[in-house]
Amino acid sequence: EEIVERHISPLRLSLHCITPEVRRKMIGKHAPHGIEMLERLLDAGIEFDAQIVLTPGYNDGLELQKTLTWAYMHPGILNIGIVPLGYTKHQCSFEKSYNDVDAALDVIDTVEPMQKHALAERGFPWVYLADEFYCNAYPDSLLEHLPPTEHYGNFEMFEDGIGIVRTSVDEWESCAEQLEHLAEVLEEEDARVYYIFGEAQRPCMARLMEEAPTKGRLVPLVVKNNHFGGNVDVTGLLCGFDVAMAIRGISAHDYVVLPKIMFNSNGYTLDDMTVDDIRDTSGVPVTVVSCSVPEYLAEIEELVVGY
């Protein structure tokens, strides 16, 4: 009642599914009542930005189609972001979550018709898929299949992992001159720089680096997340010990840079390691750099030249 009286809108909504039986399985016995409450709020003019956590065997396939169809009939649901279930090795309920090509393609094939319909009718796709679906569906040709920049509008769902890859690609491609210059600097200084990535970046940034003029000098080093396991593969969730083990043996004459997204505001990774801890454990000097492409390219040049 307070939401309606104060017209607190738009709100964030975890929708997940629409069929009562599926909602009971996923959310609990009282879950069906949530749709009744949602419809009351929608009727009162409250708007929502919705999210669906897609879970294999629960709310994908036909259930996803039903959910999207129902939601599209309610204009108050402004948009929907779909993200895959995340899981670690420290549980036994899930062993996969659209990690393979076929499963990820099935999701894309389910969602694309609704995106095209919404684009034609409303002028924007309305439902957006997390980057993981495209990365998993096109491991060897992601750059050829990634949605264009305009697909993501103002990137409202960036924090949900929707459009991050496209942003990184656009930034990289806008830095062509900067990359040419950095390639010259690295060659002149006879320097090699290893940039740490999570496995999720292999189809995108790792490939871009391998095709850039800095190839062989600015080297992507993809690190597996052994600490969490499962399908946890983004750079921001990398743990210090995994990185330390991955960089052991790198020459002291080379450089290793870590994106600052690995660290919290106090300078710790998720396994409570600092930059100094990573250096001491690996025996290799490491430097933290920005996540923005033009910024970290400039910081790498400063690191190598020494000013």
What are these model-predicted stretches?
Residues 1-75, 86-114:
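Conserved Radical SAM active-site core
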Residues 72, 79-81, 86-307:
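Auxiliary Fe-S-binding modules of radical SAM enzymes
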